[in-house]
Amino acid sequence: MIKWIIILLIVAAAASLLGMPALAGAAATGARILIGIVLVIFLLVVLGIFAVT
């Protein structure tokens, strides 16, 4: 999932540099959503609620 976050951030940066604000915003929003999901899963693992084996 971290791989997708990095890809989306690179796409957002490239689109922004090329003058495509809609694509940049969509990619940044996707990355932001994935970052939120990763943080929630991380907190659940740290608190021991969600065990990864």
From Swiss-Prot:
Membrane topology reported for the UniProt record: Multi-pass membrane protein
Protein name as catalogued: UPF0391 membrane protein msr4317
Major location category of this protein: membrane
Transmembrane segments: 4-24, 33-53
HAMAP family: UPF0391
Superkingdom of origin: Bacteria
UniProtKB keywords: Cell membrane, Membrane, Transmembrane, Transmembrane helix
Signal peptide residue numbers: none
InterPro entries reported in the protein's UniProt record: DUF1328 (IPR009760)
Protein family per UniProt: Belongs to the UPF0391 family.
Assigned GO CC terms: plasma membrane
Entry's localization field: Cell membrane
